[in-house]
């Protein structure tokens, strides 16, 4: 990017948009500060005290980073240009001179400005020897890596990998990058999670939105159009650099807070970016370590589709503590610790140098929908000022950096008009066009999803009659309310589990420690003689994956009248095994049992054979391989990849169940020294088991995985499915001489992985839309609950007429207006939209007037919803005070 020098305006490419303009301005300021140029080439022949040109920053934003020390004229060029002064044209961008010693002759300054040459450069704004540096239009241009669409020095540093762009710290990146200070890149709300952590002091100032009168249902949990805003922390000084030492000239500047840039065309500030201060290179201070570049707390600016916050974010640049160590400085130019792992390094999940998980999973900041107080400032207001003493609530100094907490009470945004009461938006178009049913409800969630959730709730709350099932104990260890999830085996049962070799049973139980439901897998008659296997159990407890049922606890008990070993897992209500979903049909094996293999011309086509769709099989493959990849990465083996131990919830969601059972049941005393000695063999067996499961799904029958039917089963797969599925099954079932990995099947999955990801995200969109329909229902219920506590109360404070007088009488008439409307013929008028609309207007307190007619129709009261809201609030607060004993 070419940065214009002097008082020139930004080049056309940089002035195209507010964001690009601010970025170009910031690069010019930062490069000029680090090179000591100061924005205009100066030489020894320049006269002191003469400002040759207009300052382009002051001309654009009425503010400048350098304050009074700026070597350009701080006047409005529109008011009239002084003789000999001029502004560069946008169409003639100037190159940033990088060659030292190239001086300008008198009267030949860039841009055609004429006048006495400037005097020597002030030493505090540059490095020694920079006063004589200059450059011409033909001088070499300095390219900023990664700016204006330029290629990044490290190809692995994509914009999606970091929320901020960083340039050269302690040997990070190429040698050119180390010459520039860190620059904050403006990020949108979708890529900038809030960084306001627990270390920040809570803001205790008065917030109108959290007061008791903010909403009628506030006592039950307020919900308004303008949601509450989190406190922001404004950092004094540089973005990523320590404060300038006391006594330096830069600290004595009039505006020590830096340049506030980025205004939109209309003059309304859309963002305020705090650019880096001039580095004190002349002080020869040591280069700070990476830990000093990490803010101790802060918040990010979040831009909504309606408005943008006018304070930028203080994002963390580095997350790993070792990035600032001397070891990183020894990297070769161009090397980066941030590159992701290659497939050869799999199955590592995330490189240790990636951004911290807290940044990726932090709760979204509700401040993104708020309008800051300064948004209501008129457009002709002069330069924005730093937080004044009246605005600052409190401040904190951490590691030499001062943070200010300011009042964040929202103010209306100029030019924006919002509805004055809650309005239900239509269905999102990307969801409306994918609706499978034309008669889907508009104001409530889909019936299918509702029924599924109700079934889950019923199963979770199910209990047994202890008199009918006395064999089930009332309490096992710290679990109670046991409910069998499978038919209990008879007392004299001799048949053992085909998987574990022991009689097993499964229960739902509630843990008395946290009151959460869990699934208990009981191993009958097992005595745990070696507790060293608990090392493997502890490793299983640490695994959290969306396709694995997490193991929580393993304990022994005699509550079942015999020694038993119990595994406690997360409970997923409504789940069924793959065996019962796909292989429980008695006709599924008809293709293999009714006729001999080889007595027909070939397998029947898929639609006649009743086979599963290939897309469903690939969805299962992606989930099962993902679970295996996580397990193998942790150094463990699944060992239960079987249709009877794979749970299916919803439609296609898989979870591997009963993990860790084999590690305890088959633990050998010879493994005392190394419990993980045989894991490599078990992992290879997992791949074979995965191949059998996939082949059974492709044949839609367990008979296809039998050894005598294996060849014909592969012929069935070859005719009815793609070659990729056939190759995957052959790879998993074929015993090879080398060690295989679950990552080897990724090329066979190929682009189908993105198909499954797209389907999952579309499903998420549909569920979010259903959730959005239910957002307002809870609020309206709270309003009705509060209204019901007021209306028709027989007595209050020994006054039997309390509900029929004063404000309560208005609320009684409003209740009749809400629910007891009749038609001209006297028939009941039932209209849900009327009820919802009136409740929303009451909650918002709109100035609309309504007529309330008494029951005898002798009086008509004309009131506004704002009057009714005031009556509602006062009356309910009176009830609350009486309930708390304050009356």
UniProtKB/Swiss-Prot annotation:
Residue ranges, annotated region (Disordered): 111-139, 280-307, 321-393
GO MF term list: ATP binding; poly(A)-specific ribonuclease activity; protein kinase activity; RNA binding; zinc ion binding
Pfam families noted in UniProt: Pan3_PK (PF18101)
UniProt key word Lipid metabolism: no
Residue numbers spanned by region Knob domain: 789-887
GO cellular component, one term: P-body
Subcellular location: Cytoplasm, P-body
Stretches the record annotates as Pseudokinase domain: 463-750
Entry-annotated residues carrying Phosphoserine: 354, 361
Binding locations of ATP: 521, 570-577, 644-645
Zn finger region (C3H1-type): 49-77
InterPro entries recorded: Kinase-like_dom_sf (IPR011009), PAN3 (IPR030844), Pan3_PK (IPR041332), Prot_kinase_dom (IPR000719), Znf_CCCH (IPR000571), Znf_CCCH_sf (IPR036855)
Any single GO BP term: mRNA processing
Main location: cytoplasm
Assembly with partners or alone: Homodimer. Forms a heterotrimer with a catalytic subunit PAN2 to form the poly(A)-nuclease (PAN) deadenylation complex. Interacts (via PAM-2 motif) with poly(A)-binding protein PABPC1 (via PABC domain), conferring substrate specificity of the enzyme complex. Interacts with the GW182 family proteins TNRC6A, TNRC6B and TNRC6C. Interacts with YTHDF3.
HAMAP family (alphabetical): PAN3
Domain notes: The N-terminal zinc finger binds to poly(A) RNA.
Family: Belongs to the protein kinase superfamily. PAN3 family.
Function: Regulatory subunit of the poly(A)-nuclease (PAN) deadenylation complex, one of two cytoplasmic mRNA deadenylases involved in general and miRNA-mediated mRNA turnover. PAN specifically shortens poly(A) tails of RNA and the activity is stimulated by poly(A)-binding protein (PABP). PAN deadenylation is followed by rapid degradation of the shortened mRNA tails by the CCR4-NOT complex.
Name of this chain's protein: PAN2-PAN3 deadenylation complex subunit Pan3
Designated gene of the protein: Pan3
